[in-house]
Amino acid sequence: MACNLCYEAESPDEAALVYAARAYQCTLQSRTPEQVMVDFAASGPLTFQLLHILPFDSVRKRMSVVVRHPLSNQVVVYTKGADSVIMELLSVASPDGAGPEKQQMIIREKTQRHLDDYAKQGLRTLCIAKKVMSDTEYAEWLRNHFLAETSIDNREELLLESAMRLENKLTLLGATGIEDRLQEGVPESIEALHKAGIKIWMLTGDKQETAVNIAYACMLMSTILKELQKKTQALPEQVSLSVDLHQPPVPQDSGLRAGLIITGKTLEFALQESLQKQFLELTSWCQTVVCCRATPLQKSEVVKLVRSHLQVMTLAIGDGANDVSMIQVADIGIGVSGQEGMQAVMASDFAVSQFKHLSKLLLVHGHWCYTRLSNMILYFFYKNVAYVNLLFWYQFFCGFSGTSMTDYWVLIFFNLLFTSAPPVIYGVLEKDVSAETLMQLPELYKSGQKSEAYLPHTFWITLLDAFYQSLVCFFVPYFTYQGSDIDIFAFGNPLNTAALFIILLHLIIESKSLTWIHMLVITGSILSYFLFAIVFGAMCVTCNPPSNPYWIMQEHVLDPVFYLVCILTTCIALLPRFVYRGAGKMNQVTSNYANQSADKSGRRPKPGPSTVFAMKSATSCAIEQGNLSLCETALDQGYSETKAFEMARPCKD
C-alpha cells in the first residue's frame, strides 16, 4: 500500500524529504490537522499528535512543529531550517564535557563536514534538530504564544519573540542535501544574455558554497573567473575598507571576468545608505554578482538600489514565493511556473515554463518589440507631418484664412479610418531580423540598448522626408491644375488621394517582412477611401456651402489627368526613400557576393559592415575565453558573415 502513496507538498523540498524517508522504511501514511501517522519498519505505525506548527518565514529561516510522541508521551519540538541558523540555536556543547555533550559535539562536527560536502556538490542543505519539553513548559509557552497571536499592537514582533523562546537549546539530529538540478538550456541562456550585454545578478537564499557551485554550473561564472576573496566580520567599517581595497578588482579590458560574491549578513551592511555608493561602484567592475543567503526583503532592496541609483532597466525572474517581492519591485517581472508553486507567476508581468525561454523572450521578442515600437512611432510622426503640412502649404494661397482644400469629414476619416490600421499591423507583425539570426547573434540585442532604431538624427531625417513628400504632394497637383477653373475640393481630391498612396507605399518600403495581412489591410484602406469618397460625394449636396465635394470623385475617376497626377506625385515623393533603401540592400548584396567570390578563390575580401560586426563578435568571444589563437583565426578567415560567425561559435564550448 505504501508504494501506491502519492504525496502533495508545498514545495519540492518537502516532497523530497518525505520520499527519502519512505525509501528508508519510514513511511508517512496519513496527515490530518490534528495528527500524523508514520509507519516504521521496526515498531509499525505510530500516530503523532500535532500540537502546534510554526510556519517558515524569511526572518527566522526555519519552521517548527510541536508533537506529542506516542511512545514516551513527551512534548517534542522538531525544527528544520538553514544550517547557519540551526547551528546557532543548538545547546552549548563542550568537547571536554560528559558523554551526551561530547557525543553532541561529535555529531555537530560531522554534520558540518557533511554540509560542506553537500554544498560543494551544489545541493540545497537543511539542518534538523529537536527539543524535548515538559508539559508545564509547553503550557506556559502556549499561553504566552496565544497572547501574542491575539495582540493588536506589535503582533509580528511578539510572535517572533514567542518563536525564539521555543526554538532554542536544540539538539542536532542531522542534515539533508537535496539536489536541485538545473533546467535544460540554462547555461546556454546565461551565456547568450552575457553576449547580449545584459548584466546578471544572482540573488539566492542558498549558502555560499551552494550558490557558487550553481553559478559555475550555469555559466554565470566562467572557469577563468578571477576570484577576489576577503574575509570580513561584516562590520560597516570593514565592508567599506573591503570595497576600497578591491576597486577596481580587474581592468574591464583585461579579457577576464570579475565576480563578486556577498553573503546576506555582509549585504545587510552594504545596503546601508552610507555604503550604497561604494557597493555599486564595486559591482560596476564585476560582470557577475552573486548574493547568497539573501532574504526576500534583501532581494527586493537590491533591485530597488540598482534601479534607482544606476538608472537602468531591471528584470527579475524567479519561481518561488521568496521571489515575489523582487519580481514586483523590478521594472519587468517574470515568473517561472513549476513545482515551486504559482505565487511568482501570479505576481509577474510575464510567465514562462522554463528558464531557457528567457533568452528568446529577450533576444527575439524584446528586440522585435523595441524595433516595432520605434518604427511605428517614427511612422506616426511621419504620417501626420506629411499630411498636416498639406494644409500648411495651402495657407500660403488662401491668405492664412484657416480654410481647407478638403472636406472636414475627409480630414477626420483620413487618420481615423484610412491610414490607422496599416501602422498597427506594421507595429504588430514587423520582423527586421529573423528569430534564428537573433538567437545565433545575441550581440544584435545591443542595438536596442543603444537605441539605434530611434536616434535623434533618425527622427529628424524622418521629419525632413515628410516635409519633402508634403511639398511634392502639394505642388505637383498645384502646378498641374494651375490656370484651370477647378474649385477648391476638386483641387484637394488629388492631394488626398496622392497622400494616401504615398503614406501607404512608404510603409511598404520601410517594412522588412511583408505578409498577406499587410497587403490585405493596405488594399482595404485604399478601397475604403475610394468607396467613402464616392458615396460621400454622391450624398453631400449641401455639406459645406458655398463649395461642396459633390460628385468630385466620380468625375476624377474618369479623368486621365487625375491618374497621371496621382502616379507622378507618388513616384517623385517616394523616389529618395526608394533609392536610399534600394542602395542599402544593393550594397549588402554586393558585399555578400564579393565575400563569396573571394571565399571560393581563397583571397581574403574586404569586410563589409556586417562582416566586421561578426568578426568583432568572434574576437570578443575569443578574448573572453582567453583563446587568442582562435581570435586570430577568426580574423584571418573571416570571408563572410557566416564564416566569421562560425569561427566565433567554438568560443561557446
UniProtKB/Swiss-Prot annotation:
Domain of life: Eukaryota
Pfam families in the cross-refs: Cation_ATPase, Hydrolase_3, PhoLip_ATPase_C
Catalytically driven reaction(s): ATP + H2O + phospholipidSide 1 = ADP + phosphate + phospholipidSide 2; a beta-D-glucosyl-(1<->1')-N-acylsphing-4-enine(out) + ATP + H2O = a beta-D-glucosyl-(1<->1')-N-acylsphing-4-enine(in) + ADP + phosphate + H(+)
Membrane association type: Multi-pass membrane protein
Keywords on record: ATP-binding, Cell membrane, Endoplasmic reticulum, Lipid transport, Magnesium, Membrane, Metal-binding, Nucleotide-binding, Translocase, Transmembrane, Transmembrane helix, Transport
Segments traversing the membrane: 376-396, 408-428, 459-480, 488-510, 517-537, 556-580
Enzyme Commission (EC) number: 7.6.2.1
Cytoplasmic side: 1-375, 429-458, 511-516, 581-653
Swiss-Prot/TrEMBL cofactor(s): Mg(2+)
Post-translational modification: Autophosphorylated at the conserved aspartate of the P-type ATPase signature sequence.
InterPro entries, sorted: ATPase_P-typ_cyto_dom_N, ATPase_P-typ_TM_dom_sf, HAD-like_sf, HAD_sf, P-type_ATPase_IV, P_typ_ATPase, P_typ_ATPase_c
Gene Ontology MF: a single term: ATP binding
Coiled coil: none
Enzyme class: translocase
Exoplasmic loop side: 397-407, 481-487, 538-555
Cellular component terms (Gene Ontology): endoplasmic reticulum membrane; plasma membrane
Primary location class: membrane
Protein's cellular compartments: Cell membrane; Endoplasmic reticulum membrane
Binding residue positions for Mg(2+): 319, 323
Stated family: Belongs to the cation transport ATPase (P-type) (TC 3.A.3) family. Type IV subfamily.
Function summary: Catalytic component of a P4-ATPase flippase complex, which catalyzes the hydrolysis of ATP coupled to the transport of glucosylceramide (GlcCer) from the outer to the inner leaflet of the plasma membrane.
Assembly, per entry: Component of a P4-ATPase flippase complex which consists of a catalytic alpha subunit ATP10A and an accessory beta subunit TMEM30A.
Protein name: Phospholipid-transporting ATPase VD
Gene source species: Macaca fascicularis
